[in-house]
Amino acid sequence: MNLQPVEQRFVMHKAVGANVQYAFAPSRSYMADGMNSLTNGVRGKSAVNKFWHGFNKNNLVAAVDLGTEKNISRISLGCLQHYRDWIFLPTAVKFEVSLDGKTFTEVAMVQNDVPVNTLALTIKDFTAKFAATNARYVRVTAFTLEACPKGHPGEGKPAWTFADELEVE
């Protein structure tokens, strides 16, 4: 028997442990370790582990309450593409900040640069770097690829978007 050591990547950042509110809940089949898994500091490694939130038919729209006003200059959302499992990277990710949780200001829109037909399992961090600003709330919108692309076995059927961690620095 050839046993391999277990590895897991943890990250500490300003949103670890913060509450997450979704406009559309993740799929019941892909809830990771619960609704706040997006801010638990645990990074996903593959499509078959419990660290990914899965969405299809709806964009991933998540707002995070940092608890207090914090100075931030970087936000990142980790996403997965696994072609054979109908999981595709979002077409773009929008990052917004707010002091009151009601009025949000866009700080960046990051476009996907990975081809939709990439067969290899790909983990991509959509990262926004911007001038330091004070914020208590962070909102992220990952725009889901609406359907599996032409030539894919699931062509025209709903595609999945998977995300593992929303990092705030």
Please place each PLM-identified region on the residue numbering.
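Residues that form or immediately flank small-molecule/cofactor binding pockets and catalytic motifs
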Residues: 25, 100, 112
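Solvent-exposed serine/threonine-rich low-complexity stretches and specific carbohydrate-binding patches
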Residues: 106-116
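Aromatic, loop-rich ligand-recognition surfaces of beta-strand-rich domains
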Residues: 44-108, 122-169
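Short, compositionally stereotyped local motifs that mark structural "simplifiers"
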Residues: 1-47
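Amphipathic alpha-helical interaction segments
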Residues: 18, 30-32, 38-39, 60, ...
